[in-house]
């Protein structure tokens, strides 16, 4: 598939903007996947190429959070293992079953997350009581978070952040940092399976990855410096935008 230099430049910018937003609030795939599909790329290859570029952004943001000691891998290694396994299973299943019913339910889930953050203004301002240990979170929650990202994906960052706030008691910047490390892990598992299936356009993926790395690094810095004032409105806005796009794509507004 031949992609011109002008289109590659646009995709570089798309990767930058999407990863900047994704590092703060999630929802970057809302931008990158339609952009890839508009190039005429087959859907499966669009998903595989998107996982490649998303890995660059997720890794860049994750390394930044690790350098700033916002995340301690010794605490969450068990969580990451189960996120990886869940994502691998989700990626395998998405290639073999009908997801029509799931797609109809998903907008309500994403909308609920946005409304939850909107109407609980103090949620995540400070660390709260931890409801689940890291071990139980890894066993009971992580597989489903990874499965969702591998199976479908939109809003994964927001869902992971909400789980960290409500179940692990993290403040919002800390939850966002941990969600990004989990998201990188799930992307890695999904990418590996798309790689085995040959569903990646490398040139496009690497160009978008370059933009993604720059955007994610800038977004991660914003989380650490302006987290409490920036993350909540971004999560709410992206949740509403994802909901609107999903219901539009399903034809709810087509008369």
Please place each PLM-identified region on the residue numbering.
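Selective hydrophobic functional segments
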Residues: 48-101, 187-234
């Amino acid at each position: 598939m031949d992609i011109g230099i002008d289109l590659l430049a646009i995709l570089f910018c798309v990767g930058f903007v999407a990863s900047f937003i994704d590092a703060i609030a999630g929802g970057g795939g809302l931008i990158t996947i339609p952009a890839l599909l508009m190039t005429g790329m087959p859907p499966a290859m669009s998903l595989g190429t998107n996982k490649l570029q998303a890995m660059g952004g997720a890794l860049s943001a994750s390394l930044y959070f690790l350098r700033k000691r916002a995340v301690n891998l010794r605490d969450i290694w068990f969580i990451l293992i189960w996120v990886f396994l869940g994502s691998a299973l989700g990626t395998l299943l998405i290639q073999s079953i009908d997801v029509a019913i799931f797609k109809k339910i998903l907008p309500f889930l994403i909308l609920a997350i946005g409304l939850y953050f909107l109407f609980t203004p103090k949620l995540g301002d400070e660390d709260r009581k931890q409801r689940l240990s890291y071990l139980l979170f890894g066993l009971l929650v992580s597989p489903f978070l990874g499965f969702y990202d591998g199976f479908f994906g939109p809003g994964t960052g927001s869902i992971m952040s909400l789980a960290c706030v409500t179940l692990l008691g993290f403040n919002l910047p800390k939850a966002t940092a941990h969600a990004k490390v989990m998201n990188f892990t799930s992307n890695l598992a999904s990418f590996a399976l798309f790689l085995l299936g040959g569903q990646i356009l490398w040139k496009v993926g690497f160009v978008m990855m370059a933009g993604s790395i720059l955007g994610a690094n800038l977004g991660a810095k914003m989380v650490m410096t302006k987290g409490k004032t920036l993350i909540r409105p971004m999560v709410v806005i992206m949740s509403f935008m994802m909901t609107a796009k999903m219901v539009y794509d399903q034809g709810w507004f087509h008369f």
